[in-house]
Amino acid sequence: MRCRSLPAGLISLAVMALLPAADLGLSRAQARPTTPIPGATAQGLPARIPVPSRQEGRRIVINGREQTARWQWLPSVGGNPSQLWLPLEVLQGQLGVASSPRVDGSLDLEWFGRKQLVPSSEQRSLDDEVAVEASPLLQAAGVRLQAEGDRLLLEMPLPGLLRVRASPPGADRQVVLDLDGAALVRQESGQILLGLLSTASQRSELQALGVAVSASREGLLLRPRGGGRVLTLGGPDRVVFAIPPGSGAGGTTASSPAAPPLDPRLQALLNRTVQLDRQVLPVGSRRMLISSVRFDPQQSPLDLRLLTRPDGMQGLTSLTALAQQEQALVAINGGFFNRVRRLPLGALKAEGRWLSGPILNRGAVGWQPGGLPSFGRLALQEQLIDERGQSWPLSSLNSGYVQRGLARYTADWGSGYQALSGNESGVLIRGGVVLQRLNGAQLQRGIPLGNEDTLVVGRSGVIPPWSETSRLTLSSQSSDPVGQQAYVMGGGPLLLQAGRVVLNGTAEGFSSAFQGQGAPRTVIGSDGRQIWLLTLQGVDHAGPTLGETAAVLRQLGLREALNLDGGSSTGLFVGNTQTVRGRGVAASIHNGLGLVPRSGRAQGDRAGG
């Protein structure tokens, strides 16, 4: 709930060598308006009678493809919106807008060289999604905007593909597509949809570079090996993506490929040790679509695993990428995260190692391989003790939840740390000894983190008190036995314990608006014998409330259950395909849960069975 394109600063030298010198004949204006031009009309649309009141809805149609997403339109003279508020996920995932957060909480948006700065004061919530006022950026790129009742229509003309270029073969080989205008860029399940017009010869050029290609009425569908990372540039408009070494000739078809077949390893387990189910159940006067996967961890050759990116806690990816990375046969999205900063907001523990600590005493699930999970509300109580025996409490571990106090970061955060707030200070610790004191300027530039390093950061006037060479001892204790398990995932609110509804979102720091809204849901639970992975979606409505979710889970026979991230993040991956998309699209997420074959145990029966 809570981009896909790389920030321009990360473009490789190989790409820079490909970029043309400034050409006034090709360059397009890189507009950076802060308000719409007075009296202007959306391109190609007739002027409309101004409507003084706000319009809003829950459906967005982008070049004919519809999804569920909240929007708000504040119209002005001529039909151009004085403000158009859209979820950040829609801009990133469905259009290809790149975003980069600043320390002060503001957000830099960039799309084909068109830029927009969004201060933190101009970011708001639409239901459970972070939203920004996007009309300047969209209009600068020529997107046509129109509201029709509950639907918002975004129409983007398909530009032409002018030229295909590539850097020499190597570890960082890049492909550059020169366009005659900005294009829709959508990444999903390892594929890239580019809303552009291409010729057969251009598709053959891409095929020769090792990129599988297909054409459709929506544009060009690319399937670069490794999934591809996409960058958009302006002046002139370009799309850049990487292809891995050794890519041979790719295939090309006239239309989009069919969905991949069910993984034969999963097929062999169905109705034996793994059960899949999809049903519609009534909850009061409303109906819910429930998709579930359940298995007995003591009898199945599958293990429940945490799914995270291999490069640390900073960044988002797709559920499909997380599942395929660990060869998971089934996967669901996991815990909460900050979509603006792309950082975790809850407990993550794997193989006994804390990757990110819990926050706000929220609900969590913990388990040992081959066993049923336990559920509870969890806090991590950590402190540093100096040589005099004085203790100093730590507020968080490897977390995107920024608050006053001392926060701890390790190499599990990533290869380095860069300040998340203003006026930070810190100390770098190695082997229990303070090596270096760090000021705010150093932290804003970034500090590398080695495997043996611990960085303690002070925020909001709290300054780490230790001098260099001071010796410190870490004390760490979980508030609940859940935290002592080898694997832990945080979510919330906790829904069921011992068959009773224990829902208390206020105690876990959730807002009243969050607690009362209906939305797609993702849940992990247990009936005392099997582990359940579930998604719940509304039939002709936004989705179940948390109370309705708890009720329907009891109806299904679950005794323990934890709500995970939901809304657009809700997703279920089954045997090569993401079968559930919370609001109609496969949104980027931070982490997940997967069912992964044990070594040598993926062919149906346990040894001797």
Language-model features: locations:
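Bacterial N-terminal signal peptides that target proteins for export
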Residues: M1-I11
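Gly/Ser/Thr/Pro-rich low-complexity, intrinsically disordered segments
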Residues: G9, L13, A17-R70, L74-Q83, ...
